[in-house]
Protein backbone atom coordinates (compact mmCIF):
# COMPACT_ATOMS: atom_id res chain seq x y z
CA UNK A 1 0.00 0.00 0.00
CA UNK A 2 1.20 3.49 -0.80
CA UNK A 3 0.34 5.94 1.98
CA UNK A 4 0.88 9.69 1.93
CA UNK A 5 0.88 11.57 5.22
CA UNK A 6 0.33 15.32 4.92
CA UNK A 7 1.07 17.74 7.74
CA UNK A 8 2.08 21.35 8.27
CA UNK A 9 5.72 21.25 9.38
CA UNK A 10 8.53 18.96 10.42
CA UNK A 11 9.31 20.40 13.86
CA UNK A 12 8.85 19.16 17.42
CA UNK A 13 5.05 19.32 17.67
CA UNK A 14 2.56 16.63 18.60
CA UNK A 15 1.25 16.09 15.07
CA UNK A 16 4.80 15.76 13.76
CA UNK A 17 5.54 13.14 16.40
CA UNK A 18 2.46 11.05 15.60
CA UNK A 19 3.14 11.19 11.85
CA UNK A 20 6.70 10.06 12.52
CA UNK A 21 5.49 7.12 14.61
CA UNK A 22 2.90 6.08 12.02
CA UNK A 23 5.28 6.50 9.08
CA UNK A 24 7.93 4.30 10.69
CA UNK A 25 5.31 1.73 11.72
CA UNK A 26 3.69 1.44 8.30
CA UNK A 27 7.04 1.42 6.51
CA UNK A 28 8.14 -1.47 8.72
CA UNK A 29 5.00 -3.32 7.60
CA UNK A 30 6.12 -2.96 4.00
CA UNK A 31 4.09 0.06 2.88
CA UNK A 32 5.48 2.69 0.52
CA UNK A 33 5.30 5.75 2.80
CA UNK A 34 5.63 9.41 1.83
CA UNK A 35 5.44 12.47 4.12
CA UNK A 36 4.54 15.85 2.62
CA UNK A 37 5.01 18.97 4.77
CA UNK A 38 3.00 21.87 3.36
CA UNK A 39 4.65 24.70 5.28
CA UNK A 40 8.20 23.38 5.62
CA UNK A 41 10.80 24.90 3.31
CA UNK A 42 13.43 22.19 3.85
CA UNK A 43 13.02 18.45 4.52
CA UNK A 44 14.99 18.65 7.78
CA UNK A 45 13.06 16.92 10.55
CA UNK A 46 13.10 17.09 14.35
CA UNK A 47 12.06 13.44 14.61
CA UNK A 48 14.24 10.94 12.75
CA UNK A 49 12.60 9.01 9.90
CA UNK A 50 13.67 5.67 8.48
CA UNK A 51 15.50 5.97 5.18
CA UNK A 52 12.66 4.12 3.46
CA UNK A 53 10.26 7.00 4.21
CA UNK A 54 10.33 9.81 1.65
CA UNK A 55 9.99 13.26 3.23
CA UNK A 56 9.27 16.33 1.08
CA UNK A 57 8.90 20.02 1.93
CA UNK A 58 6.29 21.90 -0.11
CA UNK A 59 6.58 25.31 1.58
CA UNK A 60 7.97 28.60 0.33
CA UNK A 61 6.54 31.01 -2.21
CA UNK A 62 4.65 34.27 -1.99
CA UNK A 63 4.52 36.35 1.19
CA UNK A 64 0.84 37.08 0.49
CA UNK A 65 -1.13 34.46 2.47
CA UNK A 66 -3.81 33.75 -0.14
CA UNK A 67 -1.26 33.30 -2.94
CA UNK A 68 0.99 31.22 -0.70
CA UNK A 69 -1.90 28.92 0.22
CA UNK A 70 -2.97 28.57 -3.41
CA UNK A 71 0.59 27.69 -4.45
CA UNK A 72 0.87 25.03 -1.77
CA UNK A 73 -2.44 23.48 -2.76
CA UNK A 74 -1.21 23.37 -6.37
CA UNK A 75 2.11 21.77 -5.36
CA UNK A 76 0.29 19.28 -3.17
CA UNK A 77 -2.11 18.36 -5.96
CA UNK A 78 0.80 17.78 -8.34
CA UNK A 79 2.50 15.46 -5.85
CA UNK A 80 -0.70 13.54 -5.09
CA UNK A 81 -1.37 13.11 -8.79
CA UNK A 82 2.19 11.87 -9.36
CA UNK A 83 2.23 9.53 -6.37
CA UNK A 84 -1.32 8.20 -6.85
CA UNK A 85 -1.49 6.87 -3.28
CA UNK A 86 -3.91 4.26 -1.99
CA UNK A 87 -4.58 6.44 1.04
CA UNK A 88 -3.95 10.02 2.16
CA UNK A 89 -3.91 10.82 5.88
CA UNK A 90 -3.72 14.49 6.84
CA UNK A 91 -3.24 16.23 10.18
CA UNK A 92 -4.45 19.61 11.49
CA UNK A 93 -7.46 21.66 10.45
CA UNK A 94 -6.06 23.92 7.73
CA UNK A 95 -3.97 21.11 6.26
CA UNK A 96 -7.08 18.91 6.13
CA UNK A 97 -8.91 21.57 4.14
CA UNK A 98 -6.02 22.00 1.71
CA UNK A 99 -5.77 18.24 1.22
CA UNK A 100 -9.45 18.02 0.33
CA UNK A 101 -9.09 20.86 -2.18
CA UNK A 102 -5.93 19.38 -3.69
CA UNK A 103 -7.52 15.93 -3.99
CA UNK A 104 -10.63 17.00 -5.83
CA UNK A 105 -11.34 14.69 -8.73
CA UNK A 106 -8.42 12.34 -8.02
CA UNK A 107 -10.53 9.58 -6.45
CA UNK A 108 -8.35 9.19 -3.37
CA UNK A 109 -9.23 7.73 0.01
CA UNK A 110 -8.94 10.54 2.56
CA UNK A 111 -8.62 10.25 6.33
CA UNK A 112 -8.56 13.59 8.14
CA UNK A 113 -7.14 13.83 11.65
CA UNK A 114 -8.03 16.75 13.91
CA UNK A 115 -5.22 17.48 16.36
CA UNK A 116 -6.39 20.74 17.93
CA UNK A 117 -9.54 22.26 19.35
CA UNK A 118 -11.27 23.48 16.21
CA UNK A 119 -13.88 25.37 18.23
CA UNK A 120 -11.36 27.69 19.86
CA UNK A 121 -8.29 27.84 17.63
CA UNK A 122 -7.65 31.05 15.73
CA UNK A 123 -9.07 30.80 12.19
CA UNK A 124 -10.61 33.38 9.91
CA UNK A 125 -14.15 33.01 8.60
CA UNK A 126 -13.27 31.23 5.35
CA UNK A 127 -11.24 28.51 7.07
CA UNK A 128 -13.93 28.05 9.71
CA UNK A 129 -16.62 27.73 7.03
CA UNK A 130 -14.55 25.31 4.95
CA UNK A 131 -13.72 22.94 7.81
CA UNK A 132 -17.06 21.08 8.11
CA UNK A 133 -17.48 21.09 4.33
CA UNK A 134 -14.09 19.42 3.90
CA UNK A 135 -14.86 16.91 6.64
CA UNK A 136 -17.94 15.73 4.76
CA UNK A 137 -15.72 14.59 1.89
CA UNK A 138 -13.46 12.42 4.04
CA UNK A 139 -13.82 8.68 4.47
CA UNK A 140 -13.01 8.85 8.17
CA UNK A 141 -12.35 11.53 10.77
CA UNK A 142 -9.82 10.67 13.46
CA UNK A 143 -10.45 12.57 16.68
CA UNK A 144 -8.52 12.32 19.92
CA UNK A 145 -11.16 12.73 22.62
CA UNK A 146 -14.82 12.10 23.33
CA UNK A 147 -15.25 15.87 23.76
CA UNK A 148 -14.01 16.42 20.21
CA UNK A 149 -16.46 13.90 18.76
CA UNK A 150 -19.32 15.42 20.73
CA UNK A 151 -18.51 18.79 19.14
CA UNK A 152 -19.19 17.42 15.66
CA UNK A 153 -22.55 17.82 13.92
CA UNK A 154 -24.58 14.58 13.71
CA UNK A 155 -23.75 14.04 10.03
CA UNK A 156 -20.03 13.86 10.84
CA UNK A 157 -20.17 11.81 14.04
CA UNK A 158 -20.82 8.64 12.02
CA UNK A 159 -17.45 9.10 10.29
CA UNK A 160 -15.53 9.76 13.49
CA UNK A 161 -13.27 7.41 15.39
CA UNK A 162 -11.40 8.24 18.60
CA UNK A 163 -7.69 7.42 18.57
CA UNK A 164 -5.64 9.03 21.34
CA UNK A 165 -1.95 9.76 21.11
CA UNK A 166 0.35 6.95 22.21
CA UNK A 167 3.01 6.93 24.88
CA UNK A 168 6.41 6.44 23.28
CA UNK A 169 8.73 7.82 25.94
CA UNK A 170 10.41 4.98 27.81
CA UNK A 171 12.29 6.89 30.45
CA UNK A 172 12.50 6.90 34.21
CA UNK A 173 13.53 10.39 35.22
CA UNK A 174 16.44 11.11 37.50
CA UNK A 175 15.11 11.97 40.96
CA UNK A 176 16.58 15.09 42.51
CA UNK A 177 17.53 14.88 46.17
CA UNK A 178 18.17 18.60 46.74
CA UNK A 179 16.07 21.20 48.52
CA UNK A 180 14.91 23.07 45.39
CA UNK A 181 11.49 22.16 43.96
CA UNK A 182 11.54 22.48 40.18
CA UNK A 183 8.31 23.31 38.36
CA UNK A 184 8.37 22.86 34.61
CA UNK A 185 6.20 23.37 31.54
CA UNK A 186 6.75 22.60 27.87
CA UNK A 187 5.19 23.90 24.66
CA UNK A 188 5.08 26.52 21.97
CA UNK A 189 5.36 30.00 23.42
CA UNK A 190 1.98 31.26 22.27
CA UNK A 191 -1.28 32.34 23.85
CA UNK A 192 -2.86 28.88 23.60
CA UNK A 193 -0.35 27.37 26.02
CA UNK A 194 -1.18 29.86 28.78
CA UNK A 195 2.36 30.36 30.08
CA UNK A 196 1.43 33.91 31.07
CA UNK A 197 -1.12 32.39 33.46
CA UNK A 198 1.47 29.97 34.81
CA UNK A 199 3.98 32.76 35.46
CA UNK A 200 1.31 34.73 37.33
CA UNK A 201 0.48 31.65 39.41
CA UNK A 202 4.16 31.12 40.18
CA UNK A 203 4.50 34.77 41.20
CA UNK A 204 1.54 34.35 43.57
CA UNK A 205 3.38 31.72 45.63
CA UNK A 206 7.03 32.66 45.01
CA UNK A 207 7.27 34.56 48.29
CA UNK A 208 6.14 31.60 50.41
CA UNK A 209 8.18 29.05 48.45
CA UNK A 210 11.67 30.57 48.16
CA UNK A 211 13.25 27.27 47.09
CA UNK A 212 11.04 26.80 44.04
CA UNK A 213 11.98 27.49 40.40
CA UNK A 214 10.05 27.49 37.12
CA UNK A 215 11.41 26.42 33.74
CA UNK A 216 9.37 26.75 30.54
CA UNK A 217 10.78 24.91 27.52
CA UNK A 218 9.81 25.95 23.99
CA UNK A 219 9.93 28.70 21.41
CA UNK A 220 7.31 30.90 19.82
CA UNK A 221 5.91 34.37 19.20
CA UNK A 222 5.21 35.16 22.86
CA UNK A 223 8.83 34.84 24.03
CA UNK A 224 9.44 38.59 24.35
CA UNK A 225 6.17 39.19 26.17
CA UNK A 226 6.83 36.34 28.59
CA UNK A 227 10.38 37.52 29.28
CA UNK A 228 9.07 41.01 29.98
CA UNK A 229 6.42 39.56 32.32
CA UNK A 230 9.14 37.69 34.23
CA UNK A 231 11.24 40.87 34.57
CA UNK A 232 8.26 42.95 35.65
CA UNK A 233 7.41 40.46 38.40
CA UNK A 234 11.00 40.38 39.64
CA UNK A 235 11.43 36.67 38.90
CA UNK A 236 14.38 36.71 36.51
CA UNK A 237 16.53 34.65 38.88
CA UNK A 238 13.85 31.98 39.35
CA UNK A 239 12.07 31.63 35.99
CA UNK A 240 13.93 30.34 32.92
CA UNK A 241 12.92 30.06 29.25
CA UNK A 242 15.80 28.03 27.77
CA UNK A 243 14.22 27.24 24.39
CA UNK A 244 13.47 23.94 22.71
CA UNK A 245 15.11 20.73 23.86
CA UNK A 246 16.60 18.14 21.52
CA UNK A 247 14.70 15.33 23.24
CA UNK A 248 11.99 14.91 25.90
CA UNK A 249 14.54 13.37 28.28
CA UNK A 250 16.15 16.80 28.70
CA UNK A 251 13.03 18.44 30.09
CA UNK A 252 11.81 15.34 31.94
CA UNK A 253 14.95 15.45 34.07
CA UNK A 254 14.58 19.19 34.71
CA UNK A 255 11.56 19.10 36.99
CA UNK A 256 9.70 17.68 39.96
CA UNK A 257 6.25 19.06 39.10
CA UNK A 258 4.81 19.38 35.59
CA UNK A 259 2.14 21.97 34.76
CA UNK A 260 -0.11 22.12 31.69
CA UNK A 261 -1.46 25.68 31.70
CA UNK A 262 -3.16 25.66 28.27
CA UNK A 263 -6.26 27.67 27.49
CA UNK A 264 -7.28 24.91 25.06
CA UNK A 265 -5.82 21.74 23.59
CA UNK A 266 -6.56 19.03 21.07
CA UNK A 267 -4.88 16.31 23.09
CA UNK A 268 -1.83 17.23 25.17
CA UNK A 269 1.02 14.87 24.23
CA UNK A 270 3.32 16.60 26.65
CA UNK A 271 1.05 15.78 29.60
CA UNK A 272 1.18 12.09 28.67
CA UNK A 273 4.97 12.22 28.43
CA UNK A 274 5.30 13.92 31.81
CA UNK A 275 2.97 11.49 33.54
CA UNK A 276 4.53 8.43 31.90
CA UNK A 277 7.91 9.46 33.33
CA UNK A 278 6.47 9.71 36.84
CA UNK A 279 6.25 13.50 37.10
CA UNK A 280 3.51 14.70 39.43
CA UNK A 281 1.30 16.68 37.05
CA UNK A 282 -1.18 19.55 37.29
CA UNK A 283 -3.40 20.67 34.41
CA UNK A 284 -6.05 23.25 33.71
CA UNK A 285 -9.36 21.55 32.95
CA UNK A 286 -9.41 23.10 29.49
CA UNK A 287 -11.06 21.69 26.38
CA UNK A 288 -9.99 19.13 25.20
CA UNK A 289 -8.04 16.26 26.69
CA UNK A 290 -6.80 16.95 30.24
CA UNK A 291 -9.94 15.65 31.96
CA UNK A 292 -9.74 12.40 29.99
CA UNK A 293 -6.10 11.87 30.95
CA UNK A 294 -6.38 13.04 34.58
CA UNK A 295 -9.67 11.32 35.33
CA UNK A 296 -9.13 10.91 39.07
CA UNK A 297 -7.23 12.93 41.72
CA UNK A 298 -5.04 9.90 42.38
CA UNK A 299 -3.21 10.32 39.05
CA UNK A 300 -2.91 14.11 38.83
CA UNK A 301 -4.38 17.44 39.84
CA UNK A 302 -7.02 19.08 37.64
CA UNK A 303 -7.91 22.73 38.33
CA UNK A 304 -10.56 24.97 36.74
CA UNK A 305 -9.37 26.44 33.45
CA UNK A 306 -7.58 29.79 33.65
CA UNK A 307 -8.03 29.92 37.45
CA UNK A 308 -4.65 31.35 38.48
CA UNK A 309 -5.30 31.19 42.23
CA UNK A 310 -6.35 27.52 42.13
CA UNK A 311 -3.34 26.70 39.98
CA UNK A 312 -1.04 28.46 42.45
CA UNK A 313 -2.60 26.53 45.34
CA UNK A 314 -2.12 23.20 43.54
CA UNK A 315 1.55 23.95 42.82
CA UNK A 316 2.11 25.03 46.43
CA UNK A 317 0.48 21.86 47.74
CA UNK A 318 2.70 19.56 45.67
CA UNK A 319 5.80 21.63 46.37
CA UNK A 320 5.24 21.28 50.11
CA UNK A 321 4.60 17.52 50.10
CA UNK A 322 7.26 15.28 48.53
CA UNK A 323 5.37 12.14 49.52
CA UNK A 324 2.24 13.30 47.69
CA UNK A 325 4.35 14.18 44.64
CA UNK A 326 5.83 10.70 44.53
CA UNK A 327 2.44 9.02 45.03
CA UNK A 328 0.73 11.01 42.28
CA UNK A 329 3.69 10.56 39.96
CA UNK A 330 3.72 6.79 40.39
CA UNK A 331 -0.06 6.41 40.05
CA UNK A 332 -0.12 8.66 37.00
CA UNK A 333 2.62 6.67 35.29
CA UNK A 334 0.75 3.40 35.79
CA UNK A 335 -2.55 4.87 34.61
CA UNK A 336 -1.32 6.31 31.32
CA UNK A 337 0.82 3.24 30.58
CA UNK A 338 -2.31 1.09 30.77
CA UNK A 339 -4.50 3.36 28.64
CA UNK A 340 -2.16 4.75 26.00
CA UNK A 341 0.17 1.87 25.14
CA UNK A 342 1.70 2.40 21.71
CA UNK A 343 0.79 -1.02 20.32
CA UNK A 344 -2.88 -0.50 21.15
CA UNK A 345 -2.93 2.92 19.49
CA UNK A 346 -1.09 1.66 16.39
CA UNK A 347 -3.61 -1.17 16.04
CA UNK A 348 -6.44 1.37 16.05
CA UNK A 349 -4.70 3.27 13.25
CA UNK A 350 -4.13 0.02 11.35
CA UNK A 351 -7.86 -0.70 11.55
CA UNK A 352 -8.66 2.69 10.02
CA UNK A 353 -6.03 2.29 7.30
CA UNK A 354 -7.28 -1.19 6.38
CA UNK A 355 -10.93 -0.15 6.15
CA UNK A 356 -12.41 -0.73 2.68
CA UNK A 357 -13.30 2.22 0.55
CA UNK A 358 -16.76 3.56 1.16
CA UNK A 359 -19.35 2.47 -1.37
CA UNK A 360 -20.13 6.00 -2.47
CA UNK A 361 -17.20 7.65 -4.25
CA UNK A 362 -15.98 10.83 -2.65
CA UNK A 363 -15.72 12.91 -5.81
CA UNK A 364 -17.53 12.96 -9.18
CA UNK A 365 -14.47 11.76 -11.11
CA UNK A 366 -14.10 8.79 -8.80
CA UNK A 367 -17.51 7.51 -9.87
CA UNK A 368 -16.18 6.66 -13.30
CA UNK A 369 -12.67 5.60 -12.28
CA UNK A 370 -11.65 1.96 -12.48
Question: How would you name each of these model-derived features?
Answer:
Residues 5-13, 17-67, 153, 221:
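N-terminal strand-loop element at the rim of the active site
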Residues 13-21, 97-98, 181, 185-204, ...:
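A conserved mid-protein helix/loop that constitutes part of the nucleotide-sugar donor-binding site
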Residues 90-96, 114:
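Short His-centered aromatic/hydrophobic patch
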Residues 136-172:
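Donor nucleotide-sugar binding/catalytic pocket of nucleotide-sugar-dependent glycosyltransferases
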Residues 231, 310, 317, 324-338, ...:
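A short, well-ordered alpha-helix in the C-terminal region of glycosyltransferases
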Residues 244, 263:
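Aromatic "clamp/platform" in nucleotide-sugar-dependent glycosyltransferases that forms part
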Residues 280-284:
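Short hydrophobic beta-strand element within catalytic cores of glycosyltransferases
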Residues 285, 295-309, 316-323:
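Conserved acidic donor-binding segment of nucleotide-sugar-dependent glycosyltransferases
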Amino acid sequence: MRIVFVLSGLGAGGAEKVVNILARHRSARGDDVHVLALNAETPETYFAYDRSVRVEALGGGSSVPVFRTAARIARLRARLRALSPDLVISFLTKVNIMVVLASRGLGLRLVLSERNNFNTQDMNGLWRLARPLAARLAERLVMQTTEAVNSLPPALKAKAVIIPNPITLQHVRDKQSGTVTRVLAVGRLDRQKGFDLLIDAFADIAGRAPNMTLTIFGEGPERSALEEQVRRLGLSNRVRLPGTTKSPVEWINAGDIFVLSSRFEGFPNVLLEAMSAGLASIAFDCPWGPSEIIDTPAVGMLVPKEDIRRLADAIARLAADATLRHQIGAMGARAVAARYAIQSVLQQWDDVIAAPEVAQALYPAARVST
